Design a protein with these regions (language model features):
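N-terminal periplasmic/intermembrane-space "pro-region" immediately following the signal or transit peptide
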Residues: 18-88, 220, 457
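Positively charged n-region of N-terminal signal peptides that target proteins for export
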Residues: 1-5
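Flexible, surface-exposed loop regions and adjacent strand-edge segments
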Residues: 100-106, 159, 187-192, 241-245, ...
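Outer-membrane beta-barrel "beta-signal"
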Residues: 248-259, 443-457
Length: 457
């Protein structure tokens, strides 16, 4: 390792190891019996022994593992500690969006269009095991710098896991409700930088705190089950939560050929020689109330909305003077993908039902039923260097049918998957989703340009 070699060179430069280079007169004064000079061969042998000893005792401290594992800070008989960072800088231009939009109830709102550069997110990860390799931990500091100065800028979280065997792992802490593919551990191996198509963003759950069970079953089948506090807890304090603890989310992911690329993500960066496929299923159900909803600017904000972007739990949501206090969210997602020779074609279907309302005043409906789909296609036009991609999604809702289209390029200057320059043009039609850390705005109509430099180690 580099640092061990450097340490060996440092020791070599110390005077007691360099005595052989003293003037011959000094050596003669000591006489044969007191001569402590080392020959070149003896000195090199000592350096080799010290380096071998340090390599054994220091283990793998300082090692770097690509793919998000980061740098090894500690490796002892009592545990390990790895440190990694995910961050990106983004230039965002929304000036070509319409300045106002009108929702399905005739209410006109003015949009705050952006044209700025942000170090949009910086996430710090600390992970390893302690006392027993089966008992692992992961803690993170998660920042949203587009909200700099607000209470929602920084989130601290993590989880504690125990592995009984590959088929059975249990844990508690902050985790994804794995309702869609983008919440099944694929991040950050996406075509886009920290951005979903609007059909995924609209239907999906988010992060919760709870218990979870996961594992790898036979025939390359993976599962995860979560029982948590709510659909989206980041930015929600414990006092706001109801006392039900009834959010349930589960997923199955099947890669028949066994290797679908890093974390089962999008894009065929690996250039598979043979056809590989992936299939997924997500189920989520949660009883939600208006007290337990995150703010509009919260990290990984996931609000239950009407398809025109109106938040279900806001006052006068349906323009009748009434409001919804509680509702039950149920969502199903199905997805499939195929990769070969640098090509990736992936699609997903979503259906969401929100019902069992508890209301104050008059609400004109007793349930919401929306569905949508998306497709993404990409090609590595220069292996390990340059990728192009296209995406389209559409939502079919009771209060509008929004859609979006994207075209983008990823350039990998060092031929490493997790350091890239991304440039993208996006078209929005009546976007029902948006918050500061993503490029969409609620009600957005028109084009958005962005370019991002992403780094993960």
């Amino acid at each position: 390792m580099r640092f061990l070699r450097s340490l060996g060179l440092l020791l070599w430069s110390m005077p007691w190891l360099c005595a052989a280079q003293q003037p011959a007169a000094d050596a003669a004064q000591q006489g044969p019996a007191g001569d402590r000079t080392l020959t070149e061969e003896q000195r090199q042998s000592l350096i080799d022994r010290l380096t071998a000893l340090l390599d054994e005792e220091g283990r793998r401290i300082g090692d770097f593992t690509a793919g998000g594992a980061g740098f090894r800070l500690a490796d002892t008989d009592f545990g390990t500690l790895n440190f990694s960072i995910w961050a990106y800088a983004r230039y965002l231009n929304q000036k070509n969006l319409d300045e106002t939009y009108t929702d399905s109830f005739g209410r006109t709102k003015t949009l705050d269009l952006r044209n700025d550069l942000q170090l949009n997110k910086v996430n710090l990860y600390f992970k390893g095991w302690i006392y027993d390799p089966k008992f692992s931990y992961m803690f993170f500091v998660w920042t949203q710098n587009a909200q700099m100065g607000d209470g929602s800028q920084v989130v601290l979280g993590g989880g504690l896991d125990y592995s009984f065997k590959p088929q059975l792992n249990v844990g508690a802490g902050v985790t994804q409700n794995p309702g869609t593919r983008s919440l099944r551990g694929t991040f950050p191996f996406w075509h886009r930088v920290d951005t979903r198509l609007i059909a995924d963003e609209y239907h999906r759950p988010s992060y919760t705190t709870g218990f979870y069970v996961y594992g790898n079953l036979e025939s390359n089948l993976q599962y995860k089950v979560v029982l948590g506090n709510n659909l989206s807890q980041l930015g929600v304090n414990a006092v706001q939560l109801d006392a039900e603890f009834n959010t349930f989310s589960a997923s199955l992911n099947w890669s028949p050929q066994g290797d679908y690329g890093a974390r089962g993500g999008w894009g065929d960066f690996e250039e598979h020689e043979e056809l590989v496929t992936n299939f997924g299923l997500g189920l989520t159900q949660s009883r939600e109330d208006r007290q337990s909803q995150p703010g509009e600017s919260t990290i990984e904000n996931s609000q239950i909305r009407l398809s025109d972007g109106t938040r279900l739990f806001e006052d006068n949501a349906f323009n009748t003077g009434g409001r919804v206090n509680k509702a039950t969210y149920k969502m199903l997602s199905l997805d499939a993908g195929v990769k070969r020779h640098g090509f990736d074609v992936s699609g997903a279907y979503y259906v969401r039902v929100v019902d069992d309302f508890e209301t104050e005043g008059f609400i004109p409906v007793d349930q919401l039923h929306d569905w949508g789909w998306q497709i993404q296609v990409s090609k590595m036009v220069v292996p390990k260097k340059l990728q192009v991609y296209l995406g389209y999604s559409k939502i079919f809702g009771e209060y509008g049918d929004p859609h979006d289209q994207v075209a983008g390029i990823n350039w990998y200057p060092f031929e490493e998957r997790l350091l890239r320059l991304n440039t993208e043009l996006m078209y929005l039609k009546n976007s029902p989703v948006g918050y500061p850390s993503v490029p969409m705005l609620v009600g957005g109509n028109g084009t958005v340009f962005m370019t991002s430099l992403e780094m993960v180690f």
